[in-house]
Regions:
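Serine-hydrolase catalytic core recognition
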Residues: 1-193
Length: 193
């Protein structure tokens, strides 16, 4: 869900961004490659390797933030929901010394389990892209978690089924890493509150 820079209130915001800004946090949202409306090459660079090029772009944004005199580079966090939750955990486990805290809501963990209409559209099938599915699975990254990670999951989520989070938690326990896990019984993927 790409964002745009404009000089008006974002009415589609969940309120999280406003809340964090009111608490004194600097929010930075970057449209990485894979976002739409920038041409075919920009959008399709992520094909068969979701999250990989996007992380590179996000880290360019981090470099920019670190160059600002009013940004404390030792206190960076990351937040996202759904694919953004996937990116949150990806960034925290692939760049464990950069992000101190993360909040991942309804995160995709392994594209094998995600709905076919999206997963296979961007990743191809597991049979034709086994390397891509393995490389992008966060199950193999659980051992790299260092910062504080909060995972939020609605138990009635039919978009990113709870199997994603539960399997990641199992991998974290086996690796000796410990994210916080908040379960919301009866809640769907796009919960409020």
């Amino acid at each position: 869900h790409a964002h745009n820079v404009d000089a008006r209130w974002n009415y589609s915001s969940r309120g999280w961004e406003t809340y964090m800004a009111q608490k004194g946090y600097l929010l930075f949202i970057l449209d990485n490659r894979g976002s739409e409306n920038r041409g075919k090459a920009f959008e399709q660079v992520t094909f068969r390797q979701l999250g990989q090029e996007e992380m590179k772009d996000q880290m360019k944004g981090v470099e920019y933030l670190k160059s600002l005199p009013y940004v404390d580079a030792n206190r960076l966090g990351v937040h996202g929901w759904s694919f953004g939750g996937y990116m949150t955990i990806s960034l925290m486990t692939n760049y464990p010394d950069v992000f101190k805290v993360g909040v991942a809501g309804g995160p995709v963990i392994d594209w094998h389990w995600y709905e076919v209409m999206y997963g296979e559209r961007y990743m191809d099938t597991p049979q034709t892209n086994p390397e891509g599915y393995k490389k992008t699975s966060l199950l193999y990254q659980a051992k790299n978690l260092k910062g504080k990670l909060q995972i939020i999951q609605g138990l009635n989520d039919v978009t990113v089924v709870p199997q994603h989070c539960l399997t990641f938690l199992k991998a974290c326990i086996a690796a000796g890493t410990q994210p916080d896990f908040f379960v919301y019984p009866g809640e769907p993927h796009n919960m409020r509150g």
